[in-house]
């Protein structure tokens, strides 16, 4: 009988300090998350310097809590996995330096993990991958379609050419007077409104799987500006509904088209915006109509957390991916560089 593999994972790419212990890539023994939302709310967004300071304050206790909750020790851990990027450099370095210190002190392998690979592998913690598959990544910093023919095989077939979908949500939220984080509040308002504003659906070229949300964002802002100039009433619920319907229609349409083009039967959704109820609802409908298996993680695994880093880190560890003590953080990082081709 083979020995269980225990991965200690650390995530600090943005405004959550998180540590987790993952068993055999599938079982969450602990997943401690220290959120900074309240600290950033008054600024209307994440302030990098504030985020870094909070990571410094919380990283040690977060790791200790993860180990204690998992009822394990560093001696029993097989490897330390940590987010290398993309993310805020100052924030990333707090987690990376903690991981390097532990790996050095306890003579454990150090495994660098791509943040988006982590989001993708959050799905595998709840429902096994069925290859080949298509991954739709929707978050504050990323909007991508990634084709996977096997574990650690990442081919980006589409990505945003300007704003990520989460950025558009936050900007629209601020425009209609909602506080940070805006995405969940827009989603909640959208359930109460009607689609009364004609906002654009940006499909780009016929065969393109790329996305663009800057035009939609500008259309919403301009529409509200014009209404104010004319002293006409603005109904926030209807703005939220019209905006969200425009976003969701494009995301769902391109995801389904990608699945059909690449002949895959499982669509997984990853990233913070994957917890959006409107998006989840429309994806369920579309996937049922096209006989595609849909996999979306629980909301707690959609937002940044270390369990997802441990899930991806397990397969990277098994594939022999390692880093030395020169590991650094990167604000931008190509997920395709983390692909492992099987012989």
From Swiss-Prot:
Substrate binds at residues 137-141, 170, 183, 187, 276. It catalyses: L-threonylcarbamoyladenylate + adenosine(37) in tRNA = N(6)-L-threonylcarbamoyladenosine(37) in tRNA + AMP + H(+). One of its GO terms (biological process) is tRNA threonylcarbamoyladenosine modification. The keyword Iron applies. GO terms for molecular function: iron ion binding; N(6)-L-threonylcarbamoyladenine synthase activity. Its main location: cytoplasm. It is found in: Cytoplasm. Required for the formation of a threonylcarbamoyl group on adenosine at position 37 (t(6)A37) in tRNAs that read codons beginning with adenine. Is involved in the transfer of the threonylcarbamoyl moiety of threonylcarbamoyl-AMP (TC-AMP) to the N6 group of A37, together with TsaE and TsaB. TsaD likely plays a direct catalytic role in this reaction. Belongs to the KAE1 / TsaD family. This is tRNA N6-adenosine threonylcarbamoyltransferase. It comes from Staphylococcus carnosus (strain TM300). The gene is tsaD.
